[in-house]
Amino acid sequence: MVNRLLDKIINEGYDISYDEAVRLIDEDIDKVLQGAKKLRKVFCGKHVDLCSIINAKCGKCSEDCKFCAQSIFYNTNIKTHPLCSYDEILKLAKENELEGVHRYSLVTSGRGISGKEFEDILNIYKKLKEDTKIKLCASLGIISKYQLKKLKEAGVSRYHHNLETSREFYSKICTTHSYDERIQTIKNAKGVGLDVCSGGIIGLGESFIDRINLAFELKNLKIRSIPINILMPIGGTPLENQRKLNNEEILKTIAIFKFINPKADIRLAGGRGSLENYGEEAFLSGVSATITGNYLTTQGNGIKNDIKLLNKLGLTV
């Protein structure tokens, strides 16, 4: 089955069906991983897109996402801080640019950004556009089409907004805003001409079918950058005792996402540390992009280490 699907996807531009994706769950894992590797090679080549983030505003979030350390609903003892200064944001941007990172994103806690805070962020992006050559991304929550247009005018080229999980499982993860609000934000971003980065988190307690449903939702939205985060349970959150996924289940999930979205960059994101060798095998199983450096509330592998790893695998940045 795997070889037949590969031939049709590569040579005929075939989109696999939902039933075919479900059947991949029970296929031999080595065949599925090798198939995803071939799809990455055909559609994305050897290049790996590197992006980095700064936790530009941390904590005191009004939303109740059950995996998140920054929600006001949970006692996680994280250090909160208001919007970082421009000097802090510029320093990290320049460091990342010098180390070879392609994209840099401000990430802010909260449902969304408005008022003076949004104006401050616009000014930050305008200055970054002048002071660096790195591509600029933004992850500011649920915001309006007007705000997205202003971000684009300020120099942002890509907006990040995860769906997190399937529509069917979503209510078990978040109740303070809807799945449709997330989808509308994505549509608004695309509507003003921004590229969109959107994916989710695996290991929340969802089924493999939920992951496939998410992958098809992203396909229908024509997302070309799909970050896959792996839950790292955080003390104080409702998911602090959630079972961790094993290496094989994570890799097979990533590979099936690639079969469903062959032309998209599957981006290895938060939780890489739960994979052997920081996801070395994932880069040979469909992944063609990664967040490098540190994440929002957890540590990463380091930019130099990531580039060294990718070069060892014969990949380029």
UniProtKB/Swiss-Prot annotation:
Catalytic activity annotation: (4R,5S)-dethiobiotin + (sulfur carrier)-SH + 2 reduced [2Fe-2S]-[ferredoxin] + 2 S-adenosyl-L-methionine = (sulfur carrier)-H + biotin + 2 5'-deoxyadenosine + 2 L-methionine + 2 oxidized [2Fe-2S]-[ferredoxin]
Domain of life: Bacteria
Binding residue positions for [2Fe-2S] cluster: S105, C137, C197, R267
Keyword Phosphoprotein annotated: no
Pathway: Cofactor biosynthesis; biotin biosynthesis; biotin from 7,8-diaminononanoate: step 2/2
A Pfam family that the UniProt record links to this protein: Radical_SAM
Keywords annotated in UniProt: 2Fe-2S, 4Fe-4S, Biotin biosynthesis, Iron, Iron-sulfur, Metal-binding, S-adenosyl-L-methionine, Transferase
PROSITE patterns: RADICAL_SAM (PS51918)
GO molecular function: 2 iron, 2 sulfur cluster binding; 4 iron, 4 sulfur cluster binding; biotin synthase activity; iron ion binding
Residues bound to [4Fe-4S] cluster: C61, C65, C68
Keyword Nucleus carried by entry: no
InterPro entries: Aldolase_TIM (IPR013785), BATS_dom (IPR010722), Biotin_synth/BioAB (IPR002684), Biotin_synthase (IPR024177), Elp3/MiaA/NifB-like_rSAM (IPR006638), rSAM (IPR007197)
Cofactor(s) for this UniProt protein: [4Fe-4S] cluster; [2Fe-2S] cluster
Enzyme type, top EC level: transferase
Assigned protein family: Belongs to the radical SAM superfamily. Biotin synthase family.
Family annotation (PANTHER family): BIOTIN SYNTHASE, BIOTIN SYNTHASE, MITOCHONDRIAL
Known role: Catalyzes the conversion of dethiobiotin (DTB) to biotin by the insertion of a sulfur atom into dethiobiotin via a radical-based mechanism.
Listed NCBIfam families: bioB (TIGR00433)
Protein name: Biotin synthase
Naturally occurring in which organism (per UniProt): Clostridium novyi (strain NT)
Gene this chain is encoded by: bioB
